[in-house]
């Protein structure tokens, strides 16, 4: 997997997203991500963290809870999950570039 820093304009990103929606790749990758997050225990870990943070609040505040959880959520995703999903995205992009 090669990582190249490339600045991509918003129009290009929107065009890629639209193409992925049209081909069904967007939904397929979302399902893959959800499955990996479930299998890795991330979903349960996130629920546990949310319960812990909610119990620690003096005054229940959903907005603050969501902010706290959101700050931790991405960092809790395993490297294997990130790698697998990135490989799939790269595969889709490579295929689309080859077809263009």
Swiss-Prot record:
InterPro entries the UniProt entry points to: TF_ENY2, TF_EnY2_sf
Lyase keyword on record: no
Taxonomic superkingdom: Eukaryota
Record GO terms (molecular function): chromatin binding; transcription coactivator activity
GO BP annotations, alphabetical order: chromatin organization; poly(A)+ mRNA export from nucleus; protein transport; regulation of transcription by RNA polymerase II; transcription elongation by RNA polymerase II
Subcellular location: Nucleus, Nucleoplasm; Cytoplasm, P-body
UniProt entry keywords in alphabetical sequence: Activator, Chromatin regulator, Cytoplasm, mRNA transport, Nucleus, Protein transport, Transcription, Transcription regulation, Translocation, Transport
TM region positions: none
GO cellular component, one term: nucleoplasm
Record-linked PANTHER family: ENHANCER OF YELLOW 2 TRANSCRIPTION FACTOR (PTHR12514)
Family: Belongs to the ENY2 family.
Subunit text: Component of the nuclear pore complex (NPC)-associated TREX-2 complex (transcription and export complex 2), composed of at least SUS1, SAC3, THP1, SEM1, and CDC31. TREX-2 contains 2 SUS1 chains. The TREX-2 complex interacts with the nucleoporin NUP1. Component of the 1.8 MDa SAGA transcription coactivator-HAT complex. SAGA is built of 5 distinct domains with specialized functions. Within the SAGA complex, SUS1, SGF11, SGF73 and UBP8 form an additional subcomplex of SAGA called the DUB module (deubiquitination module). Interacts directly with THP1, SAC3, SGF11, and with the RNA polymerase II.
Its job: Involved in mRNA export coupled transcription activation by association with both the TREX-2 and the SAGA complexes. At the promoters, SAGA is required for recruitment of the basal transcription machinery. It influences RNA polymerase II transcriptional activity through different activities such as TBP interaction and promoter selectivity, interaction with transcription activators, and chromatin modification through histone acetylation and deubiquitination.
Name of this protein: Transcription and mRNA export factor SUS1
Organism whose genome encodes this protein: Cryptococcus neoformans var. neoformans serotype D (strain JEC21 / ATCC MYA-565) (Filobasidiella neoformans)
Taxonomic path: Eukaryota, Fungi, Dikarya, Basidiomycota, Agaricomycotina
């Amino acid at each position: 997997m090669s990582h190249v820093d490339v600045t991509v304009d918003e129009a290009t990103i929107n065009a890629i997203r639209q193409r992925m929606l049209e081909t069904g790749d967007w939904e397929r990758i979302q399902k893959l991500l959800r499955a990996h997050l479930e299998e890795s225990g991330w979903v349960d870990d996130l629920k546990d963290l949310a319960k812990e943070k909610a119990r620690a609040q003096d005054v229940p505040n959903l907005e603050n809870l969501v902010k706290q959880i959101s700050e931790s959520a991405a960092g809790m995703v395993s490297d294997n999950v990130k790698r697998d999903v990135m490989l799939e995205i790269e595969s889709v992009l490579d295929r689309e570039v080859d077809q263009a």
